[in-house]
């Protein structure tokens, strides 16, 4: 199937009273209020796009770098972002990982338009034509559960490494 068989573009606008969201490379979609740094958003947010919980949001100019994520909450994003809403039942955990997988990121790069990487852009008409192989929902859920377990184990090991480094510094 194609991405367009799974997701449709959401272009609803005009809900400027909703929380402003942002897409980060590492943490996906999150409230802008939780991100350090200057807020470059427009004062007039009437043209900002509506995002609902479970929507995939991506930065059209940085999708080839993996600037995307599944939204954990309702909100609005800059008109520069593309918002995809699921057409079929999907596992958010699976799709969050799938859209950052090296093979799919490579497809995003190949389908982006522009003269140089500084100007590459991937809009919905291009992304909807990308072919993908999607497992059944039950398999998506199993993969997402496994990835979640691995992430938790990695976090525990990272914490252990930090503790050992502190212990080592204290021993010297």
Feature-to-residue mapping (PLM):
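Short, solvent-exposed loop/turn positions at domain surfaces
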Residues: 42-45, 116, 148
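A short glycine-rich beta-alpha junction/loop motif
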Residues: 75-82, 115-138
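Non-catalytic DNA-recognition/assembly elements of restriction-modification systems
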Residues: 1-14, 129, 137
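Short coil/turn segments at secondary-structure boundaries
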Residues: 16-23, 111-112
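Hydrophobic aliphatic residues
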Residues: 6-7, 25, 99, 103
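Short, basic/aromatic beta-hairpin or loop at an interaction surface
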Residues: 24-37
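Amphipathic alpha-helical segments
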Residues: 1, 95, 131-170
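A short beta-sheet element
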Residues: 35-36, 45-105, 109, 123
């Amino acid at each position: 199937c194609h991405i367009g068989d799974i997701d449709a573009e959401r272009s609803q606008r005009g809900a400027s009273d909703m929380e402003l969201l942002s897409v980060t490379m590492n943490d996906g979609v999150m409230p802008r209020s939780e991100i350090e740094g200057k807020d470059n958003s427009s004062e007039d947010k009437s043209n900002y796009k509506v995002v609902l919980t479970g929507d995939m949001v991506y930065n059209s100019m940085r999708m080839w770098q993996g600037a995307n994520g599944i939204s954990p909450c309702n909100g609005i994003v800059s008109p520069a972002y593309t918002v995809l809403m699921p057409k079929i039942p999907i596992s958010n955990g699976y799709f969050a990982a799938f859209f950052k997988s090296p093979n799919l990121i490579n497809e995003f790069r190949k389908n982006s338009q522009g003269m140089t990487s500084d100007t590459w852009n991937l809009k919905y008409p291009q992304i909807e034509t990308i072919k993908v192989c999607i497992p059944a929902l039950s398999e998506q859920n199993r993969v997402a559960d496994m990835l979640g377990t691995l992430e938790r184990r990695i976090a525990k090991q990272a914490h252990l490494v930090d503790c050992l480094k502190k212990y080592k510094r204290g021993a010297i």
